Amino acid sequence: MAEDTIFSKIIRREIPAAIVYEDDLCLAFKDVNPQAPVHVLLIPKKPLPQLSAATPEDHALLGHLLLKAKEVAADLGIGDQFRLVINNGAEVGQTVFHLHLHILGGRPFSWPPG
C-alpha cells in the first residue's frame, strides 16, 4: 500500500485544491508553488508512489495520463507549447511520493533544465 500523501488527501477532498480536471482515473489541479504562469499537477487516482513503481498493468493508465496532460494543456491555453515533467525519486526532486506530471507553460523554458 502506498503512503498516504497530500495528493491522496486532495483526491479524497480532505484538503482543498484548485481542481481544473477530473475523471475516473486522474485529477489535475493548480500547483500551490507555480514555476510558470501555467503550472498544473496531473495525478492518477491509483496511489503509485513514482513512475518506477508502475507495472505492465499500469500501461493503460500511463497512456491515459499523457493524453489527459495534452488535453489539460489545451484547455488551459498552452496546448501547442508546454513542458511535461516527471520527477522519479528524491535525488531528482520528487517531494511527494505519489506519481504526478507537472504541466508547465506560459513562458519560455531553457535546456538543460537543472
UniProtKB/Swiss-Prot annotation:
Alphabetical GO CC annotations of the entry are: cytoplasm
The family database entries (SUPFAM superfamilies) matched by this protein are listed as:
HIT-like
Q: What InterPro entries does the record point to?
A: Histidine_triad_CS, Histidine_triad_HIT, HIT-like, HIT-like_sf
Q: Where is this motif: Histidine triad motif?
A: 98-102
Residue ranges of every copy of the HIT domain listed in the record:
6-114
- Per the UniProt entry, the disulfide pairs are none
* UniProt name for this protein: Uncharacterized HIT-like protein slr1234
GO molecular function per UniProt: hydrolase activity
